[in-house]
Amino acid sequence: YHVAVEANYSLVRDFNIGYDPTAIVSAPDMQSDFTDFWDTAKTELAAVPIDARLTLREDLSTGARNIYFVEMQSIDNGDGNPVTIRGYYAVPKAEGTYPVVITQNGYDSGGLSDIYIPDTNGNPGWIELNISNRGQLINNRDPYKEENAFYGKYYLPDEWFAYNFGDKDTYYYRGAYMDVVRSIDFICSQEKVQKENIFMTGGSQGGAFAIAGAALGDGRLNAIAPSIPFMGDFPDYFKVGSWPASTARAMQEKLDLDNATMYKFLSYFDTKNLATLVTCPVISAIGLQDPVCPPHTNFAPYNNFKSEEKHYVVNPECKHETPADWYHTYMDFFKQHLKTVEH
């Protein structure tokens, strides 16, 4: 519920309150071919060689872990040409195998987001992969930015939500969700990885990607930690949030789509529908005052997770952000779900 307090006809304060959030029911809109749609995408991805290329960054590798710049191939954008995605990969120098955290990134609004590079002495005893999905972050900076020129022609530069809007088979998030799966493929191909102990986290768009990874990753993730996740329950999202509703409405007008057609298209990418395929443990952070990914849109997928163990952390004063201790919260959760590895 949104509460507005006025005095003398002026707004004094407005804020959100809530109760019994696990009782929130979002109207079902999963299409009958939802699973087939994603199975087809995964089959197409499997036919694309990973072709991983790792470049050691010696300048960043002075401590306990080597830091690599990594490039790999993913599913095409509808033109038949594989897309290159990039990231940073941190691996302990010491012999042995290690658990993994894959971090998915938020929306690269305006091409201004910071690019996270794991620290050579950070997160001891863990492998980390921070991946930039198609068109965003590393892929949206020189010398790679020219690869992305075609994204902007559909609406606005750096507005990936609009790319091939209305066509589920070539839409941006079909490819981007497959990039998430490809990041798991890459991790599983690396010799120092404990394949029994792969975890994924991400905030905002990255939260949606973490949900997609658990839903579409063929059970290879031990647990996920999505925070303030994007892409949840579009019919209600567009009633309570200004963006991406504004982009969707602009594309709807441009393409002359009625509401039923638009929401059917978006249902294939809605985290509330992907959540029905998630069975691994989940911990999720939610900002009660979030105007970008409002709490309702976070609980839409949360309440549909099929996981036997799931937890939510509502941060009552947070907007589109997570509290300072969120990293330690989800890492503790991941450590609780480490499986014993037989050597």
Feature names for model-found ranges:
Residues 277-286, 290:
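Short beta-strand/loop motif that positions the catalytic acidic residue
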Residues 107-178, 236-245:
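Cap/lid segment of the alpha/beta-hydrolase catalytic domain
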